């Protein structure tokens, strides 16, 4: 620790021997050794403290670098999210107000009202379609009849037979509107009246059962007569 050689130590020992004498020299040497040991321990503790501080400083620097990198990543993610939100807002602002809403459907689009009943317009449309088809068929049939009459010439219409008359009546009856018959339904109360249990009779039966279980004959104690 101290840059002393062997010659310097011998010189110091001779001076101490002359100054202190042979009696006090061993005690002085022990005291000097203790002081040197304390000094070495103090220097070692200071050196260890310096090493610990250096390690803590390195760890502190590494921690600061890690926190700086994490903050940089966080800022970059925040900027990316802000840019995406701005793009979405720009897209939504570019749309018209009615284009932002989804397509609205009403019960009328399905041919029913709010209660689920069919609308009269749908029924009329169906009947109009049937009526539109029927005249075309009639005109086609009349044109075909006229064509046949033009080819064969004017002929007398045949008389209506019984079979044709029955078929016509059947078609007329089926075309008529069906008659809806209303049926009256009456409800009859069929609840069965349950009888109320007779509590008095049940109580009497329980008392009679208890009496039956009682012993009928009681044992009489026998007295012993002591003979003198």
Curated annotation (Swiss-Prot):
Pfam families from the UniProt entry: TatA_B_E
InterPro entries, alphabetized: TatA/B/E, TatB
GO biological process assignments: protein transport by the Tat complex
Superkingdom per UniProt: Bacteria
GO molecular function per UniProt: protein transmembrane transporter activity
Keyword Cell inner membrane: yes
Membrane-protein topology: Single-pass membrane protein
Residue ranges with Basic residues bias: 206-228
Subcellular location(s) per record: Cell inner membrane
TM spans (from-to): 1-21
Keyword Cell membrane attributed: yes
Gene Ontology annotations for the cellular component aspect, listed alphabetically: TAT protein transport complex
Assembly, per entry: The Tat system comprises two distinct complexes: a TatABC complex, containing multiple copies of TatA, TatB and TatC subunits, and a separate TatA complex, containing only TatA subunits. Substrates initially bind to the TatABC complex, which probably triggers association of the separate TatA complex to form the active translocon.
Protein name: Sec-independent protein translocase protein TatB
